[in-house]
Amino acid sequence: MFKSNQKTRYYEYLIKFNIMRILDKNDIKLKLLIAHGSLGKFFHLKEFSEALEKLGVKTMLVKDSDFSTGFPSKRPQEWFGMNKKFIDLINEFDPDAVFIDRQSHFGIDTIKSKIPLFILLRGHYWSEIEWAKKTLHKGPVIKTVLWFRNKIAEECFRNATAVLPICKYLEDVVKEHHPNQSTFPFLEGIDAERWYNVEGMELKHPCVGLLQGADWWGKTKEMLILKKVMKELPNVNFYWVGDGVYKDKIILELEKFENFNWLGHLQYPEKVREFLSEIDIYALVSGMDLAPLTLKEAQLMKKPVIATNTGGISEMMEHEKTGFLVEEGNSKDLIDKI
């Protein structure tokens, strides 16, 4: 976690000693084109862009699909063509490098344009794709779409200038799949000054708050241990903020308990701040996580935190000092910590 000036200094280190070293540039006055994928991560890349501007780096932040599309997509008219918008964007901004946060046609077009490409990797892509094959993508059409998307992702990973995983655990994973690729951890800090207590939303106490998505079964399935936890702790209320393709599957199992409440999606950061202000304990119940921002945010709000000891979580917190780690699948351990 950083205060604003600390965060800016960290990004200065990142630019000077990693990106500029790879680009073989001695002057920090470079032009970086930043492309975001999901709207949920726009806020953080905007902060990144603003911090770099303070250092003299000229940046432009765009949505990747506004400028670069192709097969597979839901709109057949996007399957063919030269992505003229992308070409015009490059000609207009003339970047020294491109920074993306998902593997997409924007990355492929950057590689074809022979512009240095840096990929911010937040998730365990290879585990996600395997779980998608097992759980979501069983029909021939969807399997074909998944094959093409994986082909795009692997081409991005293989031909990028560098891949920037958000923790050391994930860097090791990248090296397993692409041992010759340049990597360095991108510690995605957050501005500590944004996370302060406000008047919270109305919740029943005592309560445990969960703030996590449900788009990947390998990660989401761990939430099912809450059935045993809520049964043993009927007087503790559990509030889940999150959404995703497995939302209904989780709710179907957990709504059987009167002490479970699903709050859906909350506006970020204002409503999330209200939620974190009110809860008594923050819990991250996950089958795989790397360096989740919500865990950092809860810690900044001075909330007791409990998290599954998986992925890169142990890099973020020290057991029994800055929070409690519980082993995956161990509902008794989670009950005891609560």
Describe the residue ranges of each PLM region:
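Conserved acidic donor-binding segment of nucleotide-sugar-dependent glycosyltransferases
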Residues: 319-320, 324-331
